[in-house]
Amino acid sequence: MCGIVGAIRAHHNVVDFLTDGLKRLEYRGYDSSGIAVNTDGKIKRVRRVGRVQLMEDAAREKGISGGIGIGHTRWATHGGVTEPNAHPHISGGMIAVVHNGIIENFESERKRLEGLGYRFESQTDTEVIAHSINHEYAQNGGKLFEAVQEAVKRFHGAYAIAVIAQDKPDELVVARMGCPLLVALGDDETFIASDVSAVIAFTRRVAYLEDGDIALLASDGIKRLTDKSGLPAERKVKVSELSLASLELGPYSHFMQKEIHEQPRAIADTAEVFLDGGFIPENFGKNAKSVFESIRSVKILACGTSYYAALTAKYWLESIAKIPSDVEIASEYRYRSVIADPDQLVITISQSGETLDTMEALKYAKSLGHRHSLSICNVMESALPRESSLVLYTRAGAEIGVASTKAFTTQLVALFGLAVTLAKVRGLVSEEDEARYTEELRQLPGSVQHALNLEPQIAAWAQQFAKKTSALFLGRGIHYPIALEGALKLKEITYIHAEAYPAGELKHGPLALVDENMPVVVIAPNDSLLDKVKANMQEVGARGGELFVFADLDSNFNATEGVHVIRAPRHVGELSPVVHTIPVQLLSYHVALARGTDVDKPRNLAKSVTVE
């Protein structure tokens, strides 16, 4: 959700980095872009609505170049999608700012600054930042770091900010509070970005800023850094494991397609910690054993796709580990009165580790007295793991497509491993049980590959969906969250309205929607609820509904008029939800192709939701 880049380079033009970095951040979602570069003592800016390429072409036409600059992709929050609202924002020709986040008190700050004589050219909260820093800069005699320090004291909300000044061609100042920002170090060049993917083509050496950090950067690195208390601090520089190849499409048409097909490897990599070392608490942290022994229940907080992974985990935690488990949407949890249990394990799930609502929900839980927290996350050094006492990283690798695929299935693998580990700590897993769970996990990548091989059959269904306006997804038990995930994927990238229900709820309302124009997708594995699901399907068929069934090889389904059947591998036991996720991902992808939508960058959506 918005992307920030910046650079100060001793020997090279910054424009190539700024435009390349912004293109690598396109997956985060945006509607406009811009850069500002200090060129011969003047700040030159170019902004455009639409793709980064349009802005890049304009920058080259204007001959913009220089050794220091900042750039931004905007996802509109305050103000419409217009060029005046695009970043960077400039105050008095002196200060240029890019900003990710929301300044909650921008209206009162705007009135204050207007009273001081500043004129506003946009509707954004970011212009408040530019004028506020410029005001402090003028007051303190041109000290950029101190101007940012003073200005941010007035802001309420979340932000990541990068600032340059017309008369400071060798200083770039950044500040972070609640939104991701990193510093990357090269040879006589220093970069900043919202995401490591923006800098990986230039350097792998990165330092992640923490909330409250303000840093003064030069081409030879970090010259000054203070923490939230205003005290000098240091941030450890690490070498990123991200590969440039993981950010390229390769032979695939879209990142979503690539990431769907990367799932056997991603699942195997995530499962490796359990297959090599066993289901042991130490996989989650040094103190995990004592924590797992002391907890009496589990609460999981997440948003979007991660929330559906959490709903799936609830079944495993209660059936395998016999531990009471509760799942809540993070954005709802943080605004209600909660009865806290200090012996409850709070689990947060986020692909990016920077989802603001999830992060704030965790902070809220800790403020209520929750002592134990565990994050399931795909990005090392992100905010959630730093805020949690325990962590398990999924090994999905970079996920560029806005619609989550491999991040979801690797979250399921991690949560399954957690459930078995908790059960083992609680003395509920026999050697035979553990051997069975281990073998199911070992066989999972192959079962997922088998499901991927169904793609031609699933693609053939796409044309039948392409002209529909609504769809219904049904599942029962642990496969109900997979129906929810399938409906979410369809609406995200095809713009077809889709809902998911437990199949047993058909008669309580959804059946009224069923007719010959309503495709009904059914998740129908060969488990203890199969006969119930078949009965629900009869109800749909009796109303003229058209059924699209994802079944197991041994489910005894026959395709008939109005009933289309695709068979996944034979039932794979507890991990069946992972396998049945693949067909609903492929269905959404191919329907999107048939409808001609932007698969990787669906309208109005962002990959990482770092604001409320």
Swiss-Prot record:
A Pfam family matched in the record: GATase_6
EC number, as in UniProt: 2.6.1.16
Statement: the UniProt record of this protein carries the keyword Transcription regulation: no
Domain of life: Bacteria
Domain SIS as annotated: residue spans: 288-428, 461-602
GO BP terms: carbohydrate metabolic process; fructose 6-phosphate metabolic process; protein N-linked glycosylation; UDP-N-acetylglucosamine metabolic process
CC annotations in GO: cytosol
Broad class of the protein's primary localization: cytoplasm
Active site: C2 (nucleophile), K607 (for fru-6p isomerization activity)
Annotated localization: Cytoplasm
Domain Glutamine amidotransferase type-2: start-end pairs: 2-220
UniProt-listed SUPFAM superfamilies: N-terminal nucleophile aminohydrolases (Ntn hydrolases), SIS domain
Catalytic activity, as annotated: D-fructose 6-phosphate + L-glutamine = D-glucosamine 6-phosphate + L-glutamate
Family annotation (CDD domains): GFAT, SIS_GlmS_GlmD_1, SIS_GlmS_GlmD_2
GO molecular function ontology, one term from the record: glutamine-fructose-6-phosphate transaminase (isomerizing) activity
UniProt xrefs under InterPro entries: GATase_2_dom, GFAT, GFAT_N, GlmS/AgaS_SIS, GlmS/FrlB_SIS, Ntn_hydrolases_N, SIS_dom, SIS_dom_sf
Sorted UniProt keywords: Aminotransferase, Cytoplasm, Glutamine amidotransferase, Repeat, Transferase
Translocase as UniProt keyword: no
Protein's job: Catalyzes the first step in hexosamine metabolism, converting fructose-6P into glucosamine-6P using glutamine as a nitrogen source.
Assembly with partners or alone: Homodimer.
HAMAP family noted in UniProt: GlmS (MF_00164)
Name under which the protein is recorded: Glutamine--fructose-6-phosphate aminotransferase [isomerizing]
Organism expressing this protein natively: Neisseria meningitidis serogroup A / serotype 4A (strain DSM 15465 / Z2491)
